[in-house]
């Protein structure tokens, strides 16, 4: 069979630990035999990030902006223990955070659903995608402990010399104070990414804040979303028959639980942090969650939503058998190749992405799975295999599908 040709390179970001092992297995077994892979490779493994003073992370993000589509392996964000383990000379920042900042992107996470794994919420029939605004709010806040009676004030000093001041609270004893912010530019970028992704995936978009209580802060989010929708996307949404819907965050939670799924739920930073974990667990497994970073100007970076699977990696180093779930990493590859094919007008590459995912579903529907999924599967006689066995089973079914 002739390999599928590519015209534009895919930006490939390698990673760490067990996911790095899976990365090579997936490439060798499921990509390279079928695709004449054209990629620009960046090693984001922690040792090389340390060696390059993290310049490789910056370079990879700039390449993603240049070429438009990237696929990323899970990476370690170092802490004190990792600094010692890897003999690092600095505690480097999260690669995802660096890439997200450079691409000015929004993270969209969605579950991979199969008939034999039922969501905890019985009426969910389709995946629910979480769009999390990954800038500001409590994550960029400053905090102060007040240890005596006094007055806390919010002060803004404009460059023009104009000064605004408002009392937060008059303390008659000890307490805590927090100040947080966001920017119109960041909120607007978030809105554009959400509307574009909704059009791209032909799904309704929900957005929720608490603007009845937060009449300036949250209200600005709502206002900007409405402005962006009315000026840039309303007509296209109508053409596609999809809807933009705003509601309060508490009402949104109730509606999500009652829904059948099949939409994008845009959330502020904290709400998205919490709700993405709730959704991944309710749908079955974090190992079955896809993640794509989308910039406002339509650049894409695909990855798995999970980490580097450290525990399995240590067992792998000891020569022990591991049954690590590669599904989310495979779907990162399939999503990136499909998008590359779509942008370059290569139908065969788009179809390959579809067929690769279908081969994964065929394998699971035949009861062949990694250990983490076996206990979750119902209505099928499931057999646990190791990572290599699972990938081999997918390849066998992929070859059948490709003829």
PLM region descriptions:
Residues 2-8, 18, 22-23, 28-53, ...:
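N-terminal alpha-helical transmembrane segments of multi-pass membrane transport
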Residues 6-25, 29, 154-247:
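Glycine-rich phosphate/diphosphate-binding loop of Rossmann-like nucleotide-binding domains
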Residues 35-41, 201-209, 233-246, 341-353, ...:
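Flexible, glycine/charged-enriched surface loops at secondary-structure junctions
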Residues 47-159, 163, 270-274:
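N-terminal glycine-rich phosphate/adenylate-binding segment common to multiple enzyme folds
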Residues 49-62, 233-262:
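A structured beta-alpha segment of the ubiquitous adenosine-cofactor-binding alpha/beta core
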Residues 256-355, 362-366:
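Glycine-rich phosphate/nucleotide-binding loop
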Residues 318-324, 342-403:
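Internal helix-turn-beta structural module
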């Amino acid at each position: 069979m002739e390999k599928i040709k590519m015209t534009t390179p895919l930006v490939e970001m390698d990673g760490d630990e067990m996911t790095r092992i899976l990365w090579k297995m997936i490439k060798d077994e499921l990509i390279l035999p079928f695709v004449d892979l054209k990629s620009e490779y960046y090693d984001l493994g922690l040792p090389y990030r340390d060696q390059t003073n993290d310049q490789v992370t910056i370079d990879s993000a700039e390449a993603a902006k240049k070429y438009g589509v990237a696929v990323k392996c899970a990476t370690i964000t170092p802490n004190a223990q990792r600094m010692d383990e890897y003999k690092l000379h600095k505690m480097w920042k999260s690669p995802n955070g660096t890439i997200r900042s450079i691409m000015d992107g929004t993270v969209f996470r969605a579950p991979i659903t199969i008939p034999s794994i039922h969501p905890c919420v019985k009426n969910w029939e389709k995946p629910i995608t979480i769009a999390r605004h990954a800038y500001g709010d409590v994550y960029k806040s400053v905090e102060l402990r007040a240890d005596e009676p006094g007055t806390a004030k919010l002060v803004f000093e404009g460059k023009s010399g104009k000064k605004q001041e408002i009392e937060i609270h008059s303390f008659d004893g000890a307490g805590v104070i927090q100040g947080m912010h966001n920017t119109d530019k960041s909120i607007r970028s978030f809105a554009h990414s959400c509307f574009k992704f909704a059009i791209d995936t032909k799904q309704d978009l929900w957005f929720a804040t608490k603007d009845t209580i937060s009449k300036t802060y949250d209200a600005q989010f709502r206002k900007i979303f409405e402005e962006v929708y009315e000026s840039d996307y309303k007509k296209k949404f109508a053409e596609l028959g999809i809807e933009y819907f705003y509601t309060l965050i508490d009402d949104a939670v109730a509606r999500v639980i009652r829904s059948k799924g099949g939409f994008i739920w845009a959330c502020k930073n904290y709400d998205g942090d919490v709700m993405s974990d709730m959704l991944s667990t309710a749908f079955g497994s974090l190992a079955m969650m896809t993640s794509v970073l989308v910039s406002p100007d339509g650049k894409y970076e695909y990855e798995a939503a999970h980490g580097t699977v450290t525990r399995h990696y240590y067992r792998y180093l000891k020569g022990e058998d591991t049954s690590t779930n590669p599904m989310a990493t495979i779907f990162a590859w399939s999503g990136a190749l499909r998008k590359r094919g779509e942008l370059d007008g290569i139908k065969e590459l788009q179809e390959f992405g579809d067929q690769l995912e279908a081969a994964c579903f065929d394998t699971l529907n035949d009861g062949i799975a990694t250990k983490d999924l076996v206990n979750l599967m119902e209505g099928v006689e499931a057999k646990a295999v190791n990572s290599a066995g699972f990938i081999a089973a997918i390849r066998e079914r992929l070859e059948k599908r490709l003829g």
